[in-house]
Amino acid sequence: MEGPRLERPLTSVPPLPSAAMEGAAAVLDSARLFRYGEHVPEGTWVARLERAFAEHFGTRFAVAVNSGGSAMFLALRSAGVEAGDVVLLNAFTLAPVPGAIEHLGAKVVLVDVDADLRVDLEDLEAAIVEHRPKAFLLSHMRGHVADMAGVVALCEAHGVILIEDCAHTLGASFGGTPTGLFGAAGCFSLQTWKQINAGEGGIIVTDDEDLAARAILASGAYMLHAQHGTPPSEDVIQRWAPLTPNCSMRLNELAAAIALPQLASLEERNDAWRAIYNRLESGISGLPNLRVPRTLDEVVHAPTSFQFVVDLPPEGIEARLAVCAERGVPIKWFGRSFATGFTSVHRHWGYVEARALPKGDAVLAGLCDVRLPSDLTAEEVDTIVAVICLAFGH
């Protein structure tokens, strides 16, 4: 095949740092993979990770759990959301996010997003007025950060609890404030394709002592909460202990040992991702029928993937994506009629009540998604650009 072709799989995962490998080996040598115990050494890996996250964000508390989905479920539950309550959710998100709400027995009400994949503030206000929600679970899906000043103002004005899904924005900020710090809690993911790769895991950050205590207890502390990295006061723990079921959502020692060293090098990886993103954006700008969603000036993003919107009929998009795939650049498309890996959208979720989402549906119809390993070279990015230009440049 003549012309550009990417030889390196975009699904490849950069190597773990040596410190993560050493930490994992130490855990395996000890055979202590469970975070709690009646006779445990001081400073378990999970407790150290919790302290490191709290220090990184400047929060009083961080709670480590077994997945980003569990983090959202526990944050909502611990903030006081109960079965039957309405929880708003922006329509551009991934299945684990409405799944966390459904897991709680609450009702998902979707909110429209604009052409740049950010929550539409007018529709958010309309949904608040109409549905009187208990909470808004704001998903910073694929790293697209909303107008947080507007979101916070609406939530505060109407008494709506704000929980942030920051699975794709560890290291991003709005107006100098990191995502995860705008509401009652921020929820992060440690899944392989995120900024920190522990295979699976989640972190809740919060300054709310009651929320932290409830999350620790519900995650399954076995009354060994004093071994937690950022423990709330005993009075607050005892207030909630009789009322809180053990949902068994703890993070394990192996995942924490792998994750902890990666937090120290987070900004280095995010800088690499930003350079990759900017080079790709610059390379495809000006292509016909194709645009890149705009990032707000107040936002410092932390992209792990790249999105663009194509204004073509479905068959035209399909044909061009086939060209890209043949040349080693597989591109996901949110506009497919059926759900595929990591790209399901609201119309695929039969458990969520349908609602008119004209702006979101218009952008999702042509939304394409490219995974970006953080160690892509400039030459590899240029090859991706060349393949996309070959496919879409006519």
Residue ranges and their predicted role:
Residues R294-L296, P303-P313, F342-V352, A365-T377:
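Conserved PLP-binding active-site segment of the aspartate aminotransferase-like
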Residues T169-G175, F182-T304:
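Active-site region of PLP-dependent enzymes
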